[in-house]
From Swiss-Prot:
Disulfide pattern: 40-88, 136-184
Taxonomic lineage: Eukaryota, Metazoa, Chordata, Craniata, Vertebrata
Tissues expressing the protein: NK cells.
Protein name: Cell surface glycoprotein gp42
Principal place of residence: membrane
UniProt-listed GO biological process terms: cell surface receptor signaling pathway; immune response
UniProt GO molecular function: MHC class II protein binding; phosphatase binding; protein phosphatase binding; transmembrane signaling receptor activity
Cell wall biogenesis/degradation as UniProt keyword: no
Covalent lipid sites (GPI-anchor amidated glycine): 206
Domain of life: Eukaryota
Cell compartment(s), UniProt: Cell membrane
């Protein structure tokens, strides 16, 4: 008698488990929109009595929508903070049957905005060897962002990946940069964009050391009679 009761219980539990299949979690709307709409789908055995099902949603193993009859989960204007691993759970009314979907990885990274490039230098007239700083900044875009600097299409130095939304490059001026276009590029795993090109200032002839040199001409004392100053060029 006890054996029959065990067998009947096993059969009953097996049939209960087959009332509905393992759920599948999917994203309904396009990844190009800012809204997030998820649907938890399961198939109920048509030969079994109708069962009242409840849907729960989880993000990174934390519940975000507890048992309800709604198989949909919606976030309006979702942002990067809503990225994560999502999962749904379907269970029967009495809670005896519970099935989980596989994880769905939602990545809500945003594209970089067009970077703004500025040139900073102390010298009034740039000469070869003077130090200048290129500063590339973006207002929007998921981190990390990779920055690259260009002079007439040729990369300057190595690409930079700082922790923030700006990168700077300190570099010595070259004579051939005179009047050429310079720009910077910002790139993350979603998109890339390039700043508006700008003209590099004219580079004066000579080097930075020559530009700052004072030339002193020594004349005989007899030539300086009546001259209260020393000639400098």
């Amino acid at each position: 008698m006890l054996l029959w009761m065990v067998l009947l219980l096993c059969v009953s539990m097996t049939e209960a488990q087959e009332l509905f299949q393992d759920p599948v979690l999917s994203r309904l709307n396009s990844s190009e929109t800012s809204d997030l709409l998820l649907k938890c789908t399961t198939k109920v055995d048509p030969n079994k009595p109708a069962s009242e099902l409840f849907y729960s949603f989880y993000k990174d193993n934390h519940i975000i929508q507890n048992r309800s009859h709604n198989p949909l989960f919606f976030i309006s204007e979702a942002n990067e903070e809503n990225s994560g691993l999502y999962q749904c759970v379907v269970d029967a009314k009495d809670g005896t049957i519970q099935k989980k979907s596989d994880y769905l990885d939602i990545d809500l990274c945003t594209s970089v905005s067009q970077p703004v490039l500025t040139l900073q230098h102390e010298a009034t007239n740039l000469a070869e060897g003077d130090k200048v700083k290129f500063l590339c900044e973006t207002q929007l875009g998921s981190l990390p962002i990779l920055y690259s600097f260009y002079m007439d299409g040729e990369i300057l130095g190595e690409p930079l990946a700082p922790s923030g939304r700006a990168a700077s490059l300190l570099i010595s001026v070259k004579a051939e940069w005179s009047g050429k276009n310079y720009s910077c590029q910002a790139e993350n795993k979603v998109s890339r964009d390039i700043s508006e090109p700008k003209k590099f200032p004219l580079v004066v002839s000579g080097t930075a050391s020559m530009k700052s040199t004072t030339v002193v001409i020594w004349l005989p004392v007899s030539c300086l009679v009546g001259w209260p100053w020393l000639l400098r060029f």
